[in-house]
């Protein structure tokens, strides 16, 4: 079973995932993340830091996703393990269209075509949503933020996320990230447990 956790920067994913490790320890899930679970992730981080051109950056994210699936996710799913990923393909579908706006005529369609035939569809995606001003306030001093960690960009990203969720309501669970952190964590842990009891591998996207 593949679970993904999504949300804009400052939505509380890191805190949530740390608590899920505790609440779901008996299920022995594999926790992973994008980017960063593979060596390609190093190139992605460099691209972000050095502000490479948008298409190069997007393709590096896709390359990291491919390596992540091949070396981490697919082997774990083949063993019947529960996999929980901090970000996945939906992060690209939410963030990169903002970066690629004006570069390509239809960035989302372009990104979806790149993923066709090999990306694995998550069984469930939990999307943490909160007012952007609250998310930005959690990110610390502005001078230490990455270029996409500003309110104008995050507003567009969250709108993209909500559009993705509206288009795929059977997979997405939208969660109010302003609720108490323990309440959020226990709700999501309960949903994951319920799904794990009856899960069957879904076909690739």
From Swiss-Prot:
It catalyses: dTMP + ATP = dTDP + ADP. Its EC number is 2.7.4.9. The gene is tmk. Belongs to the thymidylate kinase family. It is an enzyme of class 2 (transferase). ATP binds at residues 7-14. InterPro entries: P-loop_NTPase (IPR027417), Thymidylate_kin-like_dom (IPR039430), Thymidylate_kinase (IPR018094). GO terms for cellular component: cytoplasm. Gene3D superfamilies: P-loop containing nucleotide triphosphate hydrolases. This is Probable thymidylate kinase. The lineage of its organism: Archaea, Methanobacteriati, Methanobacteriota, Stenosarchaea group, Methanomicrobia. Pfam families: Thymidylate_kin. GO terms for molecular function: ATP binding; dTMP kinase activity. GO terms for biological process: dTDP biosynthetic process; dTTP biosynthetic process; dUDP biosynthetic process. Keywords: ATP-binding, Kinase, Nucleotide biosynthesis, Nucleotide-binding, Transferase. NCBIfam families: DTMP_kinase.
């Amino acid at each position: 079973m593949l679970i993904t956790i999504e949300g804009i920067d400052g939505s509380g994913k890191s805190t949530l995932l740390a608590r899920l490790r505790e609440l779901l320890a008996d299920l022995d899930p594999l926790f992973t993340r994008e980017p960063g679970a593979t060596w390609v992730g190093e190139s992605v981080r460099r691209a972000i830091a050095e502000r490479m051109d948008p298409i190069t950056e997007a393709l590096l994210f896709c390359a990291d996703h491919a390596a992540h699936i091949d070396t981490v996710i697919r082997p774990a799913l083949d063993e019947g393990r529960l996999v929980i990923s901090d970000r996945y393909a939906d992060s690209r579908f939410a963030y990169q269209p903002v970066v690629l706006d004006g570069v390509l005529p239809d960035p989302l369609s372009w990104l979806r075509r790149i993923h066709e035939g090999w990306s694995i569809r998550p069984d469930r995606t939990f999307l943490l949503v909160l007012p952007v001003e609250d998310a930005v306030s959690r990110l610390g001093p502005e001078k230490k933020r990455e270029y996409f960690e500003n309110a104008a960009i995050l507003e567009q990203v969250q709108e993209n996320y909500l559009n993705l969720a509206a288009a795929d309501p059977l997979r997405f669970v939208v969660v109010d990230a302003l609720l108490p952190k323990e309440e959020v964590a226990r709700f999501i842990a309960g949903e994951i447990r319920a799904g794990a009891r009856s899960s069957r591998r879904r076909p690739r996207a």
